[in-house]
């Protein structure tokens, strides 16, 4: 047993560690064989602690510090034998509690934290009941003094900045961790508590979004340009993979468009290659004709192919007679399977769908008629004395060809010929010198090309000259300088020439007949037209806004 003198000495040592002390007697009376009662009382004491911080830039802060000294009187009841030893250990920790009245405080040093520990031979630990009793007493005492709360909050919020080290020391006296352990003793949870220290939240860096490259028009054109021939071939009846209906299928099953590669046929329920019968293609053509836009409503768009049932059957019969890839490629354009590049669709329309296929199948090597639609009738050519205008134009054209390349005399002659070509009546004379002008266009300087293109621009306005300008040689020479490195004036002239050619096709004029073309010529024209379409897409990203606008307008017209 420990008497009251030992307990007083232990409490005295603890009080010496405090600056202003935590005072209060703690009396423990223990009777050996009788009942002992421990009565705990808590007294609230409020002290104002003002400390000064030495050094430059002293910072001040207002804090309310409340010390509650717990006076513990331990009462134990022991109903065991006299020989049993009792050990009582009472550990009292001073805990800072917020006070009603506000007293300014200047901090300089860390305020000491005192503990009063009374250790006896008993192993009884301090349970949470003592702390709960102190809290309940404090809450009941707060309800009686609610009137002073607003002033306390308003004054307490006034504070100055302190250093990080002092802030951490002060915070460690009032709470542990992130949640305050003081405020909940003095006010309900729904009320706003005093400002407490909370560590700054960690900023989580958001992952950078992955850049998805957008396909430019040029990249789409590259994917579009990888064309291949789709040949319609008969399938032998003995094969097990033959579709249930029809005996004609497509060997190639994928087509490439600006939007990517898409499957053309359906996957059959049986093993074998993919098939699309001509009956299905015919059905698709009927649907496009029924639900598609009216081709006569807008002349700026390319006309769609419309096949009558008789024409479709005739086309299929003609395809059975040949396996020529070029003829089958034209058939896929007509059926809407393959894309038709600029002017190719117009040429097919102009000649006639079945007429072109029939002529290519029956007479693949027919020679082009020596005459041209741009020439006048034989009466004008057989006249004994040519007109004065014709002779003069002949003289000018011969002078241009005979002059040195890019010479001032040649440039002057080309400029004069551009003015003479305004009249359509003399165009048949100029068109006879087109091969010589193409040489100047391919080898001449920028100025020479400019004046030659001016002459071609005037010729393209005449419906009778379109047949000569659409030839493979002319298209090849016009497409060659059609790039970003060419001068702006020359690019605009080439665009104007193709706009005029496109306009002549859209007027439904009969520019081609089955006697006026050969298979080799059509192949060359289609190849040059395809190359022109690709370069046209490249120029859609030209740096000059005027060129870019003209190119986009031409694309929409085609």
UniProtKB/Swiss-Prot annotation:
Positions annotated as ARM repeat: 300-339, 422-461, 463-503, 520-558
Coiled coil stretches, renumbered: none
Keywords: Repeat
A Pfam family hit: Arm_2
Gene3D superfamilies referenced in this protein's UniProt entry, alphabetically: Leucine-rich Repeat Variant (1.25.10.10)
InterPro entries in the cross-refs: ARM-like, ARM-rpt_dom, ARM-type_fold
Region: Disordered, residue numbers: 1-35, 139-165, 369-388
Start-end of Basic and acidic residues biased regions: 1-14, 139-156
Family (UniProt): Belongs to the eutherian X-chromosome-specific Armcx family.
Protein name as it appears in the record: Armadillo repeat-containing X-linked protein 5
Organism, as annotated: Homo sapiens (Human)
Upper classification of the organism: Eukaryota, Metazoa, Chordata, Craniata, Vertebrata
């Amino acid at each position: 047993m420990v008497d009251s003198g030992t307990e007083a000495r232990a409490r005295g040592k603890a009080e010496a560690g405090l600056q202003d002390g935590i005072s209060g007697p703690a009396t423990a009376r223990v009777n050996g064989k009788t009942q002992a009662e421990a009565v705990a009382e808590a007294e609230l004491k409020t002290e104002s602690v003002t400390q000064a911080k030495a050094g430059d830039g002293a910072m001040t802060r207002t804090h309310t510090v409340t010390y509650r000294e717990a006076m513990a009187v331990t009462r134990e009841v022991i109903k065991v034998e006299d020989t049993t030893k009792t050990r009582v250990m009472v550990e009292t920790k001073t805990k800072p509690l917020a006070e009603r009245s506000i007293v300014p405080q200047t901090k300089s040093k860390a305020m000491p934290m005192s503990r009063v520990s009374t250790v006896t031979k008993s192993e009884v630990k301090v349970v949470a009941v003592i702390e709960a009793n102190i809290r309940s007493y404090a809450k009941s005492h707060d309800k009686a003094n609610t009137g002073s709360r607003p002033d306390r909050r308003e004054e307490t919020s006034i504070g100055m900045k302190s250093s990080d080290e002092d802030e951490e020391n002060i915070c460690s006296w009032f709470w542990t961790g992130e949640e305050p352990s003081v405020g909940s003793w003095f006010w309900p949870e729904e009320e706003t508590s005093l400002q407490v220290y909370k560590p700054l939240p960690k900023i989580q860096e958001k992952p950078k979004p992955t850049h998805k490259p957008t396909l430019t028009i040029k990249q789409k054109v590259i994917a579009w340009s990888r064309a291949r021939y789709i040949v319609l071939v008969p399938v032998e009846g003995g094969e097990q993979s033959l579709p249930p209906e029809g005996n004609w299928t497509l060997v190639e099953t994928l087509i490439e468009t600006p939007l990517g590669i898409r499957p053309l046929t359906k996957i059959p329920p049986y093993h074998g290659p993919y098939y699309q019968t001509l009956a299905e293609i015919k059905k698709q053509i009927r649907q496009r004709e029924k639900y598609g836009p009216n081709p006569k409503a807008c002349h700026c768009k390319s006309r769609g192919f419309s096949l009558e049932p008789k024409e479709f059957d005739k086309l299929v019969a003609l395809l059975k007679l040949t396996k020529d890839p070029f003829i089958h490629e034209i058939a896929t354009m007509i059926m809407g399977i393959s894309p038709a590049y600029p002017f190719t669709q117009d040429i097919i329309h102009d000649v006639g769908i079945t007429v072109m296929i029939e002529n290519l199948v029956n007479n693949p090597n027919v020679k082009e008629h020596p005459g041209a639609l741009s020439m006048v009738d034989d009466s004008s050519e057989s006249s004994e004395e040519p007109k004065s205008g014709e002779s003069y134009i002949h003289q000018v054209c011969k002078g241009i060809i005979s002059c040195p390349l890019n010479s001032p005399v040649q440039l002057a002659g080309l400029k004069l010929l551009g003015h003479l070509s305004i009249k359509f009546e003399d165009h048949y004379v100029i068109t006879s010198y087109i091969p010589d002008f193409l040489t100047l266009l391919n080898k001449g300087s920028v100025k020479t090309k400019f004046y030659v293109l001016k002459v071609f621009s005037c010729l393209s306005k005449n419906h009778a000259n379109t047949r000569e300008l659409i030839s493979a040689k002319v298209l090849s020479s016009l497409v060659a300088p059609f790039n970003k490195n060419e001068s702006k004036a020359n690019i605009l002239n080439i665009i104007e020439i193709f706009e005029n050619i496109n306009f002549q096709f859209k007027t439904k004029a009969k520019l081609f007949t089955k006697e006026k073309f050969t298979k080799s010529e059509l192949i060359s024209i289609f190849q040059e037209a395809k190359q022109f379409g690709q370069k046209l897409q490249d120029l859609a990203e030209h740096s000059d806004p005027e060129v870019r606008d003209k190119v986009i307008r031409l694309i929409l017209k085609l």
